Amino acid sequence: MQFSKMHGLGNDFMVIDGVTQNVYLTEDVIRKLADRHRGVGFDQLLLVEPPYDPELDFHYRIFNADGSEVAQCGNGARCFARFVTLKGLTNKQDIHVSTAKGKMVLTLKDEEKVRVNMGEPIWEPAQVPFTANKFEKNYILRTDLQTVLCGVVSMGNPHCVLQVEDINLAPVNELGPLLENHERFPERANIGFMQVVNRNHIKLRVFERGAGETQACGSGACGAVAVGIMQGVLDNNVQVDLPGGSLQIEWEGVGHPLYMTGDATHIYDGFIKL
């Protein structure tokens, strides 16, 4: 099976063409491929499939390193767009794809940058999903470690975002797994730790569902900015600094789609026997 290794700000992916190859992946196979010592190694595996809808260009599937399938990955979406272009699967500048939970438009800006229409943030608790009687800008979550105030949103996948004073001191690996698996998130959640530098600039670390802390999380950056705007601490155009680099996030507010712009880097092509 042919594949490419790619990354978006250090969030790394194994990308597989399922259009010209017959690909069958089980959770066990994905976990073996994800092993950084005995396999390829990656945060997520991205699978390009033919479109389910004839009006779209491709179907986009995402698998975490633990083998679980998820509905969204923003950094992966940028790499997906770069991959299908590099492999000659399309020559379009605007690439229309479906995911497990909706549709996206991926726009190639230049040799490195890709702009992604991530759709509208979803706030209704039942659709996140998150257990709550109604939408609130802030929720209180209790864990064995501490009680936190957080915002909750879905960008096609669930995000819990809490503000911290100093991003370097944030208890990402201690509090992250407790919140990821909190009983109020029936499908678990991605946990964002956000330091607000000013109204147009944040620093962010993300403990990703099924992957742990990564160098960057595109949908996490989108979720953090959306929460910050809803809470009134951020403006509509925000630079997000992650351990692996920076993203630019734009959102005009409720009723509008959110846009993410950032790099997508091809590392190498490979072949592996399954």
Curated annotation (Swiss-Prot):
Pfam families in UniProt: DAP_epimerase (PF01678)
EC number: 5.1.1.7
Site (Important for dimerization): Y268
Keyword Transit peptide: no
Gene Ontology cellular component annotations, sorted alphabetically: cytosol
A Gene Ontology BP annotation from the UniProt entry: lysine biosynthetic process via diaminopimelate
UniProt entry keywords in alphabetical sequence: Amino-acid biosynthesis, Cytoplasm, Isomerase, Lysine biosynthesis
UniProt pathway: Amino-acid biosynthesis; L-lysine biosynthesis via DAP pathway; DL-2,6-diaminopimelate from LL-2,6-diaminopimelate: step 1/1
Binding site for substrate: N11, Q44, N64, G74, N75, N157, N190, E208, R209, G218, S219
Record has Amino-acid biosynthesis as a keyword: yes
Catalytic activity: (2S,6S)-2,6-diaminopimelate = meso-2,6-diaminopimelate
Catalytic center residues: C73 (proton donor), C217 (proton acceptor)
Chain positions of site Could be important to modulate the pK values of the two catalytic cysteine residues: H159, E208
Single Gene Ontology MF annotation: diaminopimelate epimerase activity
Cell compartments where the protein resides: Cytoplasm
Principal subcellular localisation of the protein: cytoplasm
Record-linked PANTHER family: DIAMINOPIMELATE EPIMERASE (PTHR31689:SF0), DIAMINOPIMELATE EPIMERASE, CHLOROPLASTIC (PTHR31689)
Family of this protein: Belongs to the diaminopimelate epimerase family.
Subunit record text: Homodimer.
Function: Catalyzes the stereoinversion of LL-2,6-diaminopimelate (L,L-DAP) to meso-diaminopimelate (meso-DAP), a precursor of L-lysine and an essential component of the bacterial peptidoglycan.
Name of the protein this chain belongs to: Diaminopimelate epimerase
